[in-house]
Amino acid sequence: VGTRISYNLYKKFGNNKLRENTFAINFKGSAGQSFGAFGVKGLKLILKGDANDYVAKGLSGASIVIKLRDESNLISNENTIIGNTVLYGATSGYLFAAGQAGERFAVRNSGATAVIEGCDSNGCEYMTGGSIVILGEVGDNFGAGMTGGMAFIYDPKSQFAKKANPETIVWQTPETEYWNCLLYTSPSPRDCLLSR
């Protein structure tokens, strides 16, 4: 779901004429593979349920929200809500998932922004751009081949160093003035640089 709609939106409006979230579509249930694949700017998909592999594959500006059904008894941060290889090749757009992702989350992401509650092995593999926030544990080999972008990992148990791939990424706790400004005060990196 999303590919055909995105094709028609792009054909009619191009890639930059629509404002974000111009067309919002709500879904309920279990989505199959490639939910929201190639979604373009102007499209917002909201799913109450769960989704299989390749969610947001090739994401190109759309916003995707996936959360548990209202009647669910599950605790979001303890359960997988999206499958493997999510955000594969995404160039822009947003993904917000109230739950964990499977393996290879954000592989080859080059510009999308996402927030999830944990992922399995090989997260952010070959990532070249974009921003990822993971509010939970990550699996082994995190950041293998990652050459760009930023990943922010909530790590209250200090386990991230054991999971990260030390050959390709550098990590640190955000204790500098710049990061405190960016994360807690201003959404603009420029403002944080000027305030120094």
Model features per residue range: what roles?
Residues V1-N52, G61-V65:
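Terminal or standalone catalytic/regulatory effector modules within metabolic enzymes
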Residues I5, F13-N15, Q33-G39, A51-L59, ...:
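Short, T/G/N/S-enriched strand-turn elements that build extracellular solenoid repeat scaffolds
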Residues T22-A24, G42-K44, G61-S63, S92-Y94, ...:
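Detector for repetitive beta-architecture
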Residues K28, F38, I46-D50, K57-G58, ...:
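Feature marks extracellular polysaccharide-active and adherence modules
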Residues Y54-V55, I64-K67, S72-S76, F96-Q100, ...:
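Glycine-rich anion/phosphate-binding loop at the beta-strand->alpha-helix junction
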Residues A62-V86, P166, V170:
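Acidic/polar low-complexity surface segments
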Residues D155-Y178:
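Terminal amphipathic helices with adjacent charged low-complexity linkers/tails
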Residues Y184-S195:
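Single conserved hydrophobic/aromatic residue that forms the stacking wall/gate
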